Amino acid sequence: MDIKDLHNKFLECSSIVDIDSRSIREGSMFFAIKGDNFDGNEFVEEALNKGAKYAIVDSDSVNIVNRKILRVKDSLGTLQKLATFHRTKTNSIVIALTGSNGKTTTKELIDCVLSSNFKTISTKGNYNNHIGVPLSLLQIEDDTEYSVIELGANNFGEIDFLTKITLPDYGYITNFGKAHLEGFIDIEGVIKAKTELYNWIIENNKTLILNFDDKQQKKFRNHKNISFTSKDDGDYKFELISGKKISVKNRDIKYHSNIYGDYNYSNICAAITIGLHFGIDSIKIKDALNSYELQNNRSQVLNMNGKEIILDAYNANPTSVSNAIESFSRIKNSKAVVLGDMFELGNNSLDEHKKIVKLLSSKNIDSCYFIGEDFFKVKSTNESFYFYRTKKEFYNSSDEILESYVLIKGSRGMKMEEIIENKIK
């Protein structure tokens, strides 16, 4: 089917797309996507019975019993092409961002700032892959002024692929850290993969958003860009105001946030920079930042049983864990760290876990609790360090967290938020 004709049918569906037959919305266009453990083609009848207006299928086993079923060569590829075609038919300014750490937080901050003055859509949750990005683009409506799209990747070429689907007007990389080393091998691989976004932006004469405090990003300063910095060489200069929650100053204006951790400083600066660049009044930006609250176990500050808990269990890699430790160690009161294993590090895993243990040995932390097979394999004899293979071992131990401040962090698969319910409450 011609993509233009398919797009017309998509508009007939009030621009609603579904890929899960369990949650079909009335009048939607259902794409039968194949996954590792499922085949959407098997659920076409269910989707139509639940109210889908059209079903896009790519299996010969599906009988074309009426005009509602449309067969294509590849359902997923067609979804991606439809998203790109739809993006070209809108007037929305599209901002794409990627990076090793802080993508979701930065996306939400940018969305929060832009939404204070414009009609804006953004990637829902972490829908940042080859399926989520097209679904995000298909949210764009005729009156959407700005779209903030998050791009994720585990391997080389994925950012380039997603960028070509997205066709962004602006591109931003939050940072380069030791994430997904299973696919990227080392930090040089991470830089190569993430800069696929910047390379596309440059090739297509679009605009880079650069953090000049990052030496890798500053290498792109001779290309069309808007920039921010803590020095004097960027378009927007920021100063970090010390405190438990991040505040920054630009010129004589102070912007306050509810966000913990110095490592979120550049995320906030990027959002303010974009807001100012697009002409949003500083008072609106201040109000937007002040209203933003982190969710989903990302640098959340919780108070319970006389303790202040920094729950940063959304995900973890060596760079984000190191940054969290550096920031947390500056707290003056008694403090404890509870860390879970970091995943997707490939052959670097034990070495990176050992580096984290060594880093904590040099910090003034009262107690450190390490959970997971990899941390257990590199355990040390430090008397204030405690190692457990599993969370269950930790729960069953007599070890008690007595400190006033507690940092909890680990990879998503470790589900470190469960520590609160089982060991602190």
What name fits each language-model region?
Residues 4, 77-212, 216-224, 275-276, ...:
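Phosphate-binding loop of NTP-binding sites
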Residues 48, 57-66, 172-308, 333, ...:
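Acidic, Mg2+-coordinating active-site environments of NTP-dependent enzymes
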